[in-house]
UniProtKB/Swiss-Prot annotation:
HAMAP family: HscA. Chaperone involved in the maturation of iron-sulfur cluster-containing proteins. Has a low intrinsic ATPase activity which is markedly stimulated by HscB. Keywords: ATP-binding, Chaperone, Nucleotide-binding. The keyword Nucleotide-binding applies. This is Chaperone protein HscA homolog. It holds the Pfam family HSP70.
Length: 621
């Protein structure tokens, strides 16, 4: 998620009156809400004593809605109207989720913008689905706290981009929540363990949930948290362990593998057994295939670990990638925090300990740790805590503009801590140009065609001037939640235009990793392509200037000079049709050399016109 500047917003007028605030972990599989009660971060429970709320929503024909456990119970009978894992779809376009579509039991509606889901209650967006989950969590908080919270800190993955963060804020707004901050999940976990109050160092946050895996490397320095690197696998989690065990059980027991009721029974038993074996060495599984007597199967922890070992090993490449991106060695990691229910599995903890060469922190329930950190942060933001807490996130990819020739001018490089604002001046390319098109892009490549387009807007009303005279100041501003605003202003008139970037789709961690990898693989090639494009832009500028000068003052040249200049201009035109940057640059320089007599005479002529009819005294003035 985006890291943020958090300053003390002020304390309550009455020092004994605490303001109500909540922290929400809006998860892919489960969600939960917490608050600081009597100075103790506490996760809130429902009427049945459960603190986890399944992130599942079921829409009913009569307009009713089931959220959480009732929705899960009906998933088998009503899969098309029961929406799970909506978080995977937040801020995503229809084209982005084609790889997921075949694995989703519900129907996606084709169209532009954010993906929508077809239900008996009409089309629903992931934002609307998430809002229902947040609404239930808010109601739980109101009942527990005895009043409306002033605001909420909601956690998001560190790799969430502008679109995904904005979608999360929109969902909260629909649920009637005032969002104090969006907080990176790994940062929230670190806050929960009080790492912000300890010594400086570098920490790894290993987050293995039900459906996703994330690894984040944080640096704590002078009270500031900074996310150095993130990596992960959005298709890896505890569910994969359940499926691995379920497949083995079906092979052992037989039964009709195509029968959804049988598969659901086996999967549920597998999940229960996995959870039990986190505490005991052996457990019994009871299966009742259709038309057959019930059968008991003894399952040991050792057998489970052998079955799930390939699953948990899949998390290690991402760990290595995060360390490599952060430029760190294993011995530089001060501590490892475990997040996510799947990290309760002893085999996972053993593997993490072996990989990082140290015992991970496990004192706080891994299901609760993110919500607890969010609650602590929310408590600080409403003024209940005296100490400042500064949290910083970084941009996952560079932000920039398209310039002439399809080149990218990076304004804010990747890994820049946010919030941040950067400005740069640009100018016009042609004489009399009165408008400029601004194209905002994201990525590490040198050419626009290889980057992701974020937004386009125009600045109009630029005073007509010669090419290169106008000054257009473009400012990029990324706020604490990672949302981008771009403003363009012509400095002499104050004419301005701006856009708040809210893309209709987002990027996941694999897409960000792919974009970074492409920038490394094609680095040398991009340098060559950029050099060629820059040479062509400069060549076109020289050719345009030559046309303008000849149209106005060709009579200042003698025939030999005009012939030499025409010949140089033709050579430049021919060079521009080729792909040799060196040839283009040499041809442009030859034109400028041949044009020197014309340039000098134009200046002399302009000077004579300026002083004609004026006295020496007037010129002195």
């Amino acid at each position: 998620m985006a890291l943020m500047q958090i300053a003390e917003p002020g304390t309550a007028a009455d020092p004994h009156q605490r303001r109500l605030a909540i922290g929400i972990d809006l998860g892919t599989t489960h969600s939960l809400v917490a608050s600081v009660l009597s100075a103790v971060p506490t996760v809130m429970r429902d009427h049945d004593g459960k603190y986890l709320l399944p992130s599942v929503v079921r829409y009913l024909g009569g307009g009713g809605i089931h959220v959480g456990y009732p929705a899960v119970a009906a998933a088998g009978q009503d899969p098309h109207n029961t929406i799970a894992s909506a978080k995977r779809l937040m801020g995503r376009g229809h084209g982005d989720v084609q790889t997921l579509a075949g694995h989703l039991p519900y129907d996606l509606v084709p169209g532009e913008g954010m993906v929508r889901l077809r239900t008996v209650a009409g089309e629903k967006s992931p934002v609307e689905v998430s809002a229902e989950i947040l609404r239930v969590l808010k109601e739980r908080a109101v009942e527990t706290l005895g009043g409306e919270p002033e605001g909420a800190v909601i956690t998001v993955p560190a790799y969430f981009d502008e679109a995904q963060r904005q979608a999360t804020k929109d969902a909260a707004r629909l649920a009637g929540l005032n969002v104090l901050r969006l907080l990176a999940e790994p940062t929230a976990a670190a806050v929960a363990y009080g790492l912000d109050k300890g010594s400086e160092g570098i920490f790894a946050i290993y987050d293995l949930g039900g459906g996703t895996f994330d690894i984040s490397i944080l640096r704590l320095q002078a009270g500031v948290f900074e996310v150095l690197a993130t990596a992960g696998d959005s298709a890896l989690g505890g569910d994969d362990m359940d499926h691995a065990l379920a497949e083995w059980l079906m092979q052992e027991e037989g039964g009709d593998a195509s029968d959804p009721l049988w598969r659901r029974q086996v999967l549920q038993q597998a999940r229960t057994a996995k959870e039990a074996l986190s505490a005991v060495a052996e457990t019994m599984i009871v299966l009742t295939p259709s038309g057959r007597a019930a059968r008991e199967i003894k399952l040991s922890r050792g057998r489970l670990e052998s079955l799930i070992q390939p699953v948990i090993q899949r998390s290690l490449p991402a760990c290595r990638r995060a360390l490599r991106d952060a430029g760190l060695k294993l011995d530089e990691i001060e501590g490892v925090v475990l997040v996510g229910g799947a990290t309760r599995v002893p085999a996972v903890r053993a593997m993490v300990e072996e990989f990082f060469r140290q015992k991970p922190l496990t004192d706080i329930d891994p299901d609760q740790v993110v919500a607890i950190g969010a609650a602590i942060q929310a408590d600080a933001l409403v003024g209940n805590q005296r100490e400042d807490l500064l949290l910083m996130d970084v941009l996952p990819l560079s932000l920039g503009l398209e310039t002439m020739g399809g080149l990218v001018e990076k304004i804010i490089p990747r890994n820049t801590p946010i919030p941040v604002a950067r400005a740069q001046e640009f100018t016009t390319f042609k004489d009399g140009q009165t408008a400029m098109s601004i194209h905002v892009v994201q990525g590490e490549r040198d050419l626009v065609q290889d980057c992701r387009s974020l937004a386009r807007f125009s600045l109009r009303g630029i005073p007509p001037m010669v090419a290169g005279a106008a000054r257009i100041r473009v400012t990029f501003q990324v706020d604490a939640d990672g949302l981008l605003a771009v403003r363009a202003e012509e400095t002499s008139t104050g004419v301005r235009s701006e856009v708040v970037v809210k893309p209709s789709y987002g990027l996941n961690d694999e897409e960000i990793a792919r974009m970074l990898q492409d920038s490394f693989i094609h680095g040398a090639e991009d340098v060559v392509r950029r050099r060629l494009s820059e040479a062509k832009v400069e060549g076109e500028r020289v050719r345009e200037a030559l046309r303008t000068a000849l149209a106005a003052d060709a009579d200042l040249l003698d025939p030999a000079e005009r012939e030499a200049l025409d010949k140089a201009g033709t050579a430049l035109t021919n060079a521009l049709s080729g792909d040799d940057a060196g040839v283009i640059t040499a041809a442009a320089e030859a034109v400028e050399t041949a044009a020197e007599p014309l340039v000098q005479r134009r200046m002399d002529s302009a000077l004579r016109r300026a002083i004609t009819g004026r006295s020496i005294d007037e010129l002195g003035d």
